[in-house]
Amino acid sequence: MQKLENLSKNQKIILDLIEKSSGPLKAYSILFNVKKQGIKAPLQVYRALDKLIEIGKIHKIESRNAFVACKNSNCQVSKATAFSICESCEDVTEVSNLKLSKYLSNFADKSGMKYNKYNLEFFGLCKNCKK
């Protein structure tokens, strides 16, 4: 993973915002929140987001078209990610499960297809919402 000091100013600003967020953030919400810090155009946000994904600092939640900070220092960022998403409160938890990773690896091998990456999203109710 790339060190924080190697990030651009825009990447640092956006990473800081995403890390402090209590939930996934959409690109235009990010733009709205960083305008005062000199990031004025959507393209600036998308470039920073792309780089932060590439280096493993954040993940994209495909179903929400939103972004979250990577909480798992051992994750295979660009290859395999899985998330548990609460349908009630929208809480997102990164799933780190060795058995799941092995199963999906075997699945890819048996299917004969070469997967570049996968992003799994599990939906349900978190422990707080199912009470």
Predicted regions, residues:
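Short acidic, hydrophobic short linear motifs in intrinsically disordered regions
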Residues: 24-34
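Short amphipathic alpha-helical elements of helix-turn-helix/winged-helix folds
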Residues: 13-21, 33, 55
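Short alpha-helical segments that sit at the start of domains
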Residues: 1-16
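Non-DNA-binding regulatory cores of transcription-related proteins
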Residues: 60, 64, 69-131
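A short, conserved structural fragment
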Residues: 53-61
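Key DNA-contact positions within bacterial/archaeal DNA-binding proteins
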Residues: 43
